[in-house]
């Protein structure tokens, strides 16, 4: 377990995830030496801002500057670095928890309300159900390819790329993070003491959507999950 809680600059992200000489690789090696274990799984939690820069999704370090393309940290670079690290025989599963808002107000935004989504004209039209009076529009969920990780990486994202990621009104973190922590403490468990990827996502997704619909009505937040093995056990409760 280790954390970075101060301002993260572009050089920090470069130094952390460099697959050959980076902090992460060194930390893996030292952790295994200390624990005596032969392998470990990696779990990353990141809370911060993102945007679209030159057509791709990027993380915004503290020193991000539109005039300097190297001050951004592309998601595809994060993924490629993690794939290289995963080639280490000591590294098993990699799981990301990304409480990231890709619509930072300082950059171009791509916020879309559910009612503004354009249907694919080639898609088969389904008969719409009549909404009850006062019933909120159900957001259309499509997994955004722009943030899709390689198949061997499981990634939980706080929202879709066309949505705002909200802070919790009463806590010092995001609504996604709040329910992530509650889920890991046991609220996501179905009673067998094993919290799977799917259980955790279902719990987070339901509660984040319910909370943001109440608070923000037509601009809800819908968490996203990318996983090739949703039944994998993430955490075992005592």
Regions found by a protein language model. Give the residues of each.
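Signal peptide-proximal N-terminal region
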Residues: 1-8
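Sec-exported extracytoplasmic/periplasmic mature domains
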Residues: 3, 29-36, 83-90, 185-189, ...
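Second-shell loop/turn segments in exported
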Residues: 10-18, 63-71, 164-170, 188-191
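Caspase-like (clan CD) cysteine peptidase catalytic core
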Residues: 19-47, 51-111, 193, 199
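Short, solvent-exposed loop/turn segments at the edges of secondary structure
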Residues: 53-54, 149-151, 175, 229-230
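Extracellular S/T/G-rich loop segment that most often corresponds to the catalytic His/Ser-adjacent loop
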Residues: 94-171, 177
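Caspase-like cysteine protease fold
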Residues: 187-238
């Amino acid at each position: 377990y280790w954390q970075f809680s101060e301002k993260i600059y572009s050089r920090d992200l470069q130094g952390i995830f460099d697959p050959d000489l980076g902090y992460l690789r060194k930390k893996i090696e030292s952790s295994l030496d200390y624990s005596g274990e032969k392998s470990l799984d990696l779990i990353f939690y990141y809370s911060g801002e993102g945007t679209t820069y030159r057509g791709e999704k990027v993380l915004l370090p503290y020193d991000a500057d539109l005039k300097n393309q190297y001050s951004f940290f592309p998601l595809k670079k994060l993924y490629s670095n993690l794939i290289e690290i995963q080639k280490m025989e000591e590294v098993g599963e990699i799981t990301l928890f990304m409480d990231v808002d890709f619509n930072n107000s300082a950059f171009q935004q791509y916020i879309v309300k559910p009612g503004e989504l354009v249907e694919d004209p080639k898609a088969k039209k389904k008969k719409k159900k009549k909404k009850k009076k006062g019933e909120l529009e159900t957001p259309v969920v499509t997994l955004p390819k722009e943030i899709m990780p390689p198949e061997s990486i499981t990634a939980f994202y706080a929202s879709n790329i066309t949505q705002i990621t909200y802070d919790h009104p009463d806590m010092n973190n995001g609504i996604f993070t709040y329910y992530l922590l509650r889920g890991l403490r046991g609220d996501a468990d179905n009673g067998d003491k094993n919290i799977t990827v799917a259980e955790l996502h279902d719990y987070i997704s339901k509660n984040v959507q319910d909370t943001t619909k109440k608070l923000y009505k037509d601009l809800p937040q819908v968490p996203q999950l990318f996983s090739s093995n949703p039944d994998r056990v993430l955490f075992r409760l005592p």
